[in-house]
């Protein structure tokens, strides 16, 4: 692969990432969820409607420190999107759940991503979709390795 092609794809990745963030932000500003940021929506997405995760589990998924996620969750609790639930199994463990409002934004965000993905894959055959999936898995692996290296550099 040529250096020019790599630069071109790199620029496209940056442009697409920034575009997704801008569109998500614009969408939020036109809904009843004007009081929430895109980062907070991604925290809600990590909490999910289906599991009652701990703050540590959410932090791990978002690749953020537990302290950073705790601050975000505190805001989401104040805004009425998230509740803290005491574990039935272990009273010391606090789990996270979504309020009705949190579930609404969760579903809206899931719908947005589904529409975006369907649009992205529109007109592709299964072989092309498999290539896209393989490429995204390569990117995900790179990000995981880079994240782990960053963690080990912080400990030096």
PLM region descriptions:
Residues 1-4, 130-156:
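C-terminal regulatory/oligomerization modules of transcriptional regulators
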Residues 9-12, 39, 101, 128:
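N-terminal positioning helix adjacent to the helix-turn-helix/winged-helix DNA-binding module
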Residues 23-65:
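N-terminal helix-turn-helix DNA-binding core of bacterial DNA-binding proteins
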């Amino acid at each position: 692969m040529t250096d020019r092609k790599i630069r071109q794809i790199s620029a496209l990745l940056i442009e697409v990432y920034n575009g997704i963030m801008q569109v998500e932000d614009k969408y939020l500003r036109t809904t009843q969820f004007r009081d929430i940021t895109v980062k907070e929506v991604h925290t809600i997405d990590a909490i999910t409607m289906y599991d009652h995760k701990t703050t540590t589990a959410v932090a791990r998924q978002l690749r953020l420190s537990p302290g950073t996620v705790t601050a975000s969750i505190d805001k989401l609790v104040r805004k009425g999107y998230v509740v803290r639930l005491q574990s039935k199994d272990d009273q010391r463990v606090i789990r996270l759940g979504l309020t009705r409002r949190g579930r609404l934004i969760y579903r809206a965000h899931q719908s947005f991503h589904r529409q975006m993905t369907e649009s992205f894959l529109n007109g592709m055959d299964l072989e092309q979709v498999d290539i896209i999936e393989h490429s995204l898995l390569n990117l995900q692996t790179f990000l995981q390795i880079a994240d782990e290296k960053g963690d080990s550099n912080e400990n030096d």
